[in-house]
Amino acid sequence: MIELNKIYNEDCLEGMKKIPDGSIDMILCDLPYGTTASKWDSIIDFEKLWEEYERIISDNGAIVLTASGSFTHKVISSNEKLFRYKWIWIKSRPGNFVNANNRPMTKYEEILV
């Protein structure tokens, strides 16, 4: 069991195991996209991720994930039955500085619900 109002620095798949079934009203997550060679940017196993998300989300809860580029398709394809719609977040400043030398910086990100 996790303690409320406390920050945990741990693997999300391990941390979610401590969360009671159906107890979360909203999951808002900016997953690693797997677009860089950085260790922190490894794509999380979608099958394991969805297993935990579906277990902890309440009946009327929302799962909201940010995505961009080809990662958007990967997220939607990983669980099409739960995908409802997509919003476009238009940013006031372009981002994606990590890849600025390889590609244009983007001014939007997709929000998948």
Task: Name each model-derived stretch.
Residues 2-113:
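Core catalytic lobe of class I
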